[in-house]
């Protein structure tokens, strides 16, 4: 119980440091939080999902997308093992992996992750078509945003 609490505190501190542009402190605290979850075999719990998602986003911002993907793949495996690969948590991780693939210009892999996520959303939200449509829109809007960011990156590297 205490490990859970301390882990959440580190995750929250990491999030605050990230918001304030202190990436190294953010990374340090996020890693401490995740380490505690690992040490006490709590990685399968619901709390680990946003922690690892946020950590993966930070790693991607720090130009470490491979480490981010590795963390998310490990999380996806745990969710599949302890819950299933048809639950919303699994879909959320697939979506995060799709985002990282988009950011790193791995479009075909991004599509694969987004399709897996959408299939789960469609099944879970079968009675709520407006949620499905909202999620489709959200994912579709990522493509042009990433395209613009990639173009800026290419242009910036030419200067």
PLM ranges: what are they?
Residues 34-39, 73-81, 118-122:
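Amphipathic alpha-helical segments of tetratricopeptide repeats
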Residues 4-19, 30, 46-61, 88-99, ...:
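Conserved alpha-helical positions within TPR/SEL1-like repeat arrays
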Residues 111-159:
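C-terminal non-catalytic interaction modules
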């Amino acid at each position: 119980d205490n490990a859970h609490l301390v882990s959440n505190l580190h995750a929250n501190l990491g999030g605050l440091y990230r918001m304030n542009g202190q990436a190294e402190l953010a990374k340090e605290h996020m890693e401490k939080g995740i380490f505690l979850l690992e040490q006490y075999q709590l990685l399968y719990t619901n709390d680990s999902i946003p922690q690892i998602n946020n950590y993966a986003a930070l790693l991607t911002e720090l130009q470490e997308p491979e480490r981010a993907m590795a963390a998310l793949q490990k999380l996806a495996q745990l969710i599949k093992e302890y819950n299933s690969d048809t639950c919303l948590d699994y879909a959320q991780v697939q979506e995060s992996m799709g985002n990282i693939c988009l950011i790193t210009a791995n479009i075909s892999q991004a599509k694969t992750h987004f399709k897996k996520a959408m299939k789960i959303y469609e099944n879970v939200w079968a009675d709520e078509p407006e949620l499905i449509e909202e999620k489709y829109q959200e994912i579709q809007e990522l493509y042009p945003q990433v395209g613009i960011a990639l173009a800026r990156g290419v242009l910036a590297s030419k200067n």
